């Protein structure tokens, strides 16, 4: 969470969990996580299997293992204290520019631009008259421009960043912006240009029938097995868990091998069972 009484570690965990996951889904899992593992030392010492199970339905469970690696790095290289420079933070596993900037700005009031997808969209529409940013990640020029727009006081700058994030999430949305309700639409370059559409517009990513869904089904089955205290599942049961109506015949084997390669699951040659990593 971004409250003043939350530790640097708690804030970092929250920001990593919030990547690509709605905050409403993150909050209860974050609370349980922080009660169980309140420090980097606790997470570093936990088993990978317990970490993945606690990640629950946040999605993209590889983030859970990166967070464990992040905790281990903080313990080994920073004495268990979360570093507070952009350079050191972005060297941690699973921590990119946005996550690092969010921690510095919202937790410590350090003056740094926080560029999530909402902020980037608001700025490119208002200033450039484009529907969407031209690049997937912020360019150096985009970051420098955002920095120049921030007030000098770091705490004030953080409030501006939060306001832009909320504005983009609630008003200047991705596909259905509420321009008629927008307080600044008379000054917005995109509105003044007649809301021109970009040639390449983002489209909702499908989930049903995809490899991502099949991977999720395998991970859910193994999380359940671990929670129930069993010694994993047979390979056949794992492949059956990945079968989706309408999916191609090779999908279960494909996603099974991908999860093995990514270190998300383990096949024990002695027991001939598939488990979460230890």
Predicted regions and their residues:
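Auxiliary Fe-S-binding modules of radical SAM enzymes
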Residues: 243-244, 262, 275-278
């Amino acid at each position: 969470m971004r409250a003043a009484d939350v530790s640097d570690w708690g804030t970092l965990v929250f920001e990593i969990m919030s990547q690509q996951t709605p905050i409403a889904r993150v909050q209860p899992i974050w609370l349980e996580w922080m009660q169980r593992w309140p420090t980097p030392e606790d997470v570093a010492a936990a088993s990978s299997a317990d970490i993945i199970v606690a990640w629950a339905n946040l999605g993209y469970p590889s983030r859970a293992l990166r967070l464990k690696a992040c905790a281990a790095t903080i313990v080994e290289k920073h004495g268990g204290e979360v570093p507070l420079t952009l350079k050191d933070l972005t060297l941690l596993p699973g921590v990119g520019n946005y996550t690092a900037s969010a921690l510095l700005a919202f937790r410590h009031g350090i003056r740094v631009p926080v560029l999530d997808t909402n902020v980037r969209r608001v700025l490119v529409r208002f200033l450039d008259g484009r529907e969407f940013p031209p690049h997937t990640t912020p360019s150096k020029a985009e970051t420098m421009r955002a920095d120049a727009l921030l007030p000098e006081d770091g705490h004030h700058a953080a409030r501006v960043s939060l306001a832009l994030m909320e504005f983009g999430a609630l008003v200047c949305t991705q596909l259905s912006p509420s321009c008629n309700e927008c307080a600044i639409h008379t000054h917005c370059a995109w509105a003044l240009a007649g809301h021109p559409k970009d040639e390449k517009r983002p489209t909702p990513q499908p989930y049903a029938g995809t490899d991502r869904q099949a991977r999720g089904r395998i991970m859910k089955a193994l999380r359940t097995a671990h929670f129930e205290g069993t010694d994993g599942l047979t390979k056949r049961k794992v492949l059956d868990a990945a079968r989706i109506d309408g999916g191609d015949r090779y999908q279960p084997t494909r996603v099974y091998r991908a999860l093995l390669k990514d270190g998300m699951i383990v096949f024990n040659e002695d027991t001939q069972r598939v488990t979460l990593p230890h």
